[in-house]
């Protein structure tokens, strides 16, 4: 299984909303991500569904803005 396929699998979550946003992100942006953005995306995927969703929709601010390069793309989806 290649890296993109593994990431696509990790994007399958317990929330339909997250599944939709994350799958669209993979479809639309994965190929253009640089190494740093890929690392940030993997770190985001390690968060709980609830925490990740709240960060994406802006209900929770991330503490140090480290995810902004990827969050901006996620929020476009």
Swiss-Prot record:
Protein name: FAD assembly factor SdhE
UniProtKB keywords: Chaperone, Cytoplasm
General function of this protein: An FAD assembly protein, which accelerates covalent attachment of the cofactor into other proteins. Plays an essential role in the assembly of succinate dehydrogenase (SDH, respiratory complex II), an enzyme complex that is a component of both the tricarboxylic acid cycle and the electron transport chain, and which couples the oxidation of succinate to fumarate with the reduction of ubiquinone (coenzyme Q) to ubiquinol. Required for flavinylation (covalent attachment of FAD) of the flavoprotein subunit SdhA of SDH and other flavinylated proteins as well.
PANTHER family membership: FAD ASSEMBLY FACTOR SDHE
GO cellular component: cytoplasm
Pfam families found in the cross-reference section: Sdh5
Chief localization: cytoplasm
Subcellular location: Cytoplasm
